[in-house]
Amino acid sequence: MSEKSDRSDSVSFPRQIADRIIQAIRLAAQQEILPHFRALQPEQIAQKSAALDLVTTADLASEALITEALSALFPDALIIGEEAVARRPGLLDNIESAPLCFIIDPIDGTWNYANGLATFGVIVAATRFGQPIFGLLYDPLQDDYMIAEQGVEGAGFVASCGAKKSLKTSVGGALNQLNGFIHLYQVPAPKQARLAACLPHFGNMSNLRCSCHEYRLLAQGSFDFCLAGIVKPWDHAAGVLICQKAGGYVKMLDGREYSAAHKDGYLLAACNQATWNTLQELFAFLLTP
């Protein structure tokens, strides 16, 4: 089989395997995440690359638990956690060549979590040669999640009781009707003022400091777009697939297809292609030197 055809083959997860992935995430939440929420001691919180970039003992313990569970289910898969990458940045170089890679954000929104805010989640994605094929956005406090899989129609929301519903992105509209997430601090300082000048064009702008819940709001039609200037795979791979399967349109701002192997660039996720095209034209100045 040629490399090209091998890369095009899909990978699917039987329902029972997906259920076991979810069980592992729930176990991590019950054992490591929820018991420490609003109960962390100062020595259990550490700074990584910047004052707002935090890691807690709960991040480390939950990532270890989820990694162990995924390794047992998929012994041949590459498994990459955010905190593992903090120790070994070179792990990211292996995503593009991996036929199956799991990417874990054990607590997305760690700053919120460490400061007692309830806006945090767990993100798990699977990729094939960098392309997302499975995505899960889990809310530990509500014990519910959004899920999508390549080769399976649509994206779904599953409540803690097991009730399911399909997800659908919004219909969009005029600029002054759009609600979005723009991460101003992720843009180089010389362009921040010009990007800030765009904000009054929109209906509402926000920043949750939590990709998990930003993508959830986009996928369920509550928000219309998200512009990100930092494209860490644990923040985006799952949400990209879920939004696409819910009817959204997601590409890099320069028109490239999204890949979890990308290390730089701007990622624009929108409720539909027409909205994406309008926003791409507005934000195109970010692509100039």
Regions found by a protein language model. Name each.
Residues 60, 83, 106-109, 140, ...:
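Generic detector of well-ordered alpha-helical packing
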Residues 130, 162-164, 255:
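Detector for glycine-centered tight turns/loop "hinges" at secondary-structure junctions
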Residues 169-289:
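An extended, acidic
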Residues 33, 59, 70, 110, ...:
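Residue-level signal for inorganic ion chemistry
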Residues 153-166, 273-278:
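Short helix-loop capping/hinge motifs at secondary-structure junctions, enriched
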Residues 95-155:
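DPxDG-like acidic metal-binding loop motif
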Residues 1-107:
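N-terminal subdomain of lithium-sensitive/metallo-dependent phosphomonoesterases centered on the IMPase/IPPase/PAP
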